[in-house]
Structures are given as C-alpha cells and as structure tokens.
Amino acid sequence: MSAIVDIIGREILDSRGNPTVECDVLLESGTMGRAAVPSGASTGSREAIELRDGEAGRYNGKGVLKAVEHINTEISEAIMGLDASEQAFLDKTLLELDGTDNKSRLGANAMLAVSMAVAKAAAEEAGLPLYRYFGGSGAMQLPVPMMNIVNGGAHANNSLDIQEFMIVPVSQPTFREALRCGAEVFHALKKILGDRGMSTAVGDEGGFAPNFGSNDECLSTILQAIEKAGYRAGEDVLLALDCAASEFYHDGKYQLAGEGLQLSSAEFSDYLATLADKFPIVSIEDGMHESDWDGWKLLTDRLGKKVQLVGDDLFVTNTRILKEGIEKGIANSILIKINQIGTLTETFAAIEMAKRARYTAVISHRSGETEDSTIADIAVGLNAGQIKTGSLSRSDRISKYNQLLRIEEDLGDIASYPGKSAFYNLR
C-alpha cells in the first residue's frame, strides 16, 4: 500500500509573478510527488473557483495562503493514510470534503495541487513515468502542438481582439520534427517583425504581441513566416485561432475594437467563415460567447465539418456542460484545462466523454503557468492527440515541450505523431 504520510502545501509564484499553490505528497516508502497549479487570465464564468485571499495589501489580493492552509489542515487530515494509487477514491474524498458544486470552499487550486501531487507520488512509487501511469501500455501517441506565436486580447497589450494566433505543424513524422518546425517559424516571424520595425516583445504565453492593423494582416504575416522558414502553409503547417469571444462580447454584439466592427452572432459566424476560406485554418476556439449557444449552433452548422470548433469557456472541462453540448450539436471539440475542474479524475472523465462522442480533446496550459509539466504526460497518457502550451519562448512553456521530447525518446520506435489525423472528425 502506497500510504500517504505527509502533505505540504505552499505558496509559490507563477509565470506572471502572481501567487499559486504547490503541494508535496510524501508516501510511506519515502517517495514524493510535487505539483504546482496554473491560473488563467480569460476565464469561463462556470470554471471551478480558485481560492484567493483578497487582501489588498498583499500581492494585490491574489495571495493563496487560505488555499495552502486548507491543504495543510483539512485536506491533510482527510487523506492522511490513504493509498495514493487509488486516485478516483482520493479525488472523491476531496470532492466530498469541499461539498460545493464549484469547489469554492476549499478552492480548486488547493484540490488540484493535491490531486496532481498524489498521482506523481503514486507513479514514482510504481516505478513508472507519469504518462505511462496515466495511460498504461496504450500510451504511445504524441500530441500535435498548437503553438501560439502571436498573442492578442487579454494575453497582450496590443490592438488585436483575437487572443491567440497559432501554427499547427502537421506533415512531420515525429514530434521532435514538429517542434523544430514551430521554432523555425517562430524565429522567421521574429525576423519579419524586426525588419518592419514592429515589436518583438512577447505576451503571457510567449508569442509576439505587435500592433497589426487587422486579423487579416496578422494571419498573412504568419503565412509569410511559414514560407520564409521553408515550409508550405496549408500542407506542412496549418493555422488555428483562439478568439476568446466572451472577452469582446458586449450588449449582444461581438465588438472587434481593433477593426471597428460590431457584429451579431450570424455576422461574426460569417466573419470567421471568411477567415477560414481565406487562410488554412484548421481550428477555432471559443468562436462565440460562452452563453451564446444559438451563435454556437450557427457556427457549428456553418463550419463544423471543415474546422475544429473548440469549446473552452463554453465547456470549462465539465462533463455536465459537455454532455449538453454534445446533445445539442454544439462545437466538435473540447479544451481540457485541469484547473477549470479541479481534480484529475474529473479531467480524465471529460476527455473520455469527448472521445466517445467523436469530439476531439485538446490538452491546454493556462496563461499563468509554472515549470510543472504534468499536462504533457496527460496528453500522451490519454492519447489526446493535441496540446496547446504556448509559443517557442519562456521556460514555463518550453518545459512542456521538453517533457514531450523526453517522452518521445522514452517511447522509442513505438512513438507516433498523428499530424493531420489528429483532426479526425473533419472532412
């Protein structure tokens, strides 16, 4: 039995310099698991609640000492002595201890830190790499990365309303080659921006954050970077967007301030369809406001056969909401953010529900990250097929890519890279 004998929560800093929660779980054998949780900037209203202290004089109210205290007292008492290999039972214990629908009492940040640290300790105890502990012998597929090379919206201080402009390398035989492709395009884009006298400062997720005149101009510039790096846009490298539309939806209109547009749901659906016709866009995330289900239905009917339509704020990694979306034919993919739901067991349930409905599942980081690379192991362990973990700069992003390189090396000849087949529900 891998009995838990000690649990230590602490406050650390994330990639934005804000406090977050880290947890150590020690087992009877002396094995330890350590995990740190991320935090988002643009968040869905139905996400599990991360507990912040709210003391204005300390970290601008963003301290997490209350969450840490919950780990070191209530949670510690509840799970001390439990078997770390019983992940589902342990997560159930956490849920019952919290007793709320949205984890607002203990805090999703406290609960997730413990859930992840327990899994890491159990994997170490079993002598297994984390991805293998999660997925067993079937874990052998590396994910296709969506690399956020231009940041806008809430992730940058510029004129772009769309939050993320991403490249998706799909023709490469291995993850290692896909990563090289992404890095080469990133550096080609930096050279193009520099030659134009545009900013090469980076945003929260490591992408550039220049002031483009329009979304068209941004996408066209990315195509130039792909070609400059020696790749073919639409063949070797596809494009993806995260609109984060909830951030610019006001008074019933999609207000693209950077382009001076105020659009209805139908008009914004047309706008996105026009972009998808003009550019090799394979995926659009949060193309409508999280509560605009009629708009989502319009967009799905319009583009759902040819473009991956990812629900992030829409589904918030919640099986109850995802089930409703599947029944209503809304979107065709779910973004998986572990801190949106707060335990590994619930995260894995959302991935499995999506797969059964032939929705794709995209494992994702948050804009506020740490060096913790657990999401890389989740992506491989659950054969998710896709991952979003930022650009080709900032060590909080690169740590996930480097972990995927290690996993691919560990898998050896049985490793596979799906490329375009990761988008299996498109025609």
Curated annotation (Swiss-Prot):
Entry keywords, A to Z: Cytoplasm, Glycolysis, Lyase, Magnesium, Metal-binding, Secreted
EC top class named in words: lyase
EC number(s) given by UniProt: 4.2.1.11
One Pfam entry name: Enolase_C
Positions of Mg(2+) binding: 242, 285, 312
Pathway recorded for this protein: Carbohydrate degradation; glycolysis; pyruvate from D-glyceraldehyde 3-phosphate: step 4/5
Reaction(s) catalysed by this chain's protein: (2R)-2-phosphoglycerate = phosphoenolpyruvate + H2O
PROSITE patterns (UniProt xref): ENOLASE (PS00164)
GO terms for biological process, alphabetical: glycolytic process
Protein name in the entry: Enolase
Organism: Burkholderia thailandensis (strain ATCC 700388 / DSM 13276 / CCUG 48851 / CIP 106301 / E264)
